[in-house]
């Protein structure tokens, strides 16, 4: 990824599309033989580094509400609202300040139940 980050020019068209209003959904190939699950945070950081999203908040939206909207699921999920489906994590730290906070999960709630 470091080599790719060094060559930001190869992502110019994607960044231009994003700045023109094209919705960019975060996604990875995590779990495939070449991409481990622990690559999610570095991939989000890479999106921020490229300027593809507006900071950490933009990266989080890309993984949640924007992904739901692109997949036409935004009436059911993607944001925390009454009546929507939601799995929630409680973490140490603030991902708006540091995306690596997403790796410091203290509690997970799935369909309203604690997954301790």
Which ranges hold each PLM region?
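Small/polar (Gly/Ser/Thr/Ala-rich) solvent-exposed segments
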Residues: 97
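Active-site gating loops and adjacent loop-to-helix segments of metal-dependent hydrolytic enzymes
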Residues: 1-7
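His/Asp/Glu-enriched, well-ordered alpha-helical/loop segment
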Residues: 7-91
């Amino acid at each position: 990824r470091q080599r790719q980050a060094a060559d930001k020019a190869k992502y110019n068209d994607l960044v231009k599309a994003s700045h023109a209003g094209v919705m960019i959904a975060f996604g990875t190939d995590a779990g495939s033989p070449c991409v481990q699950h622990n690559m999610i945070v570095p991939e989000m950081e890479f999106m921020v580094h490229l300027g593809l999203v507006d900071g950490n908040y933009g990266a989080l939206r890309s993984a949640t509400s924007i992904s739901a909207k692109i997949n036409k699921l935004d009436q059911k999920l993607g944001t925390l609202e009454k009546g929507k489906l939601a799995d929630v994590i409680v973490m140490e730290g603030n991902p708006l300040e540091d995306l690596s906070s997403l790796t410091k999960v203290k509690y997970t709630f799935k369909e309203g139940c604690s997954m301790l």
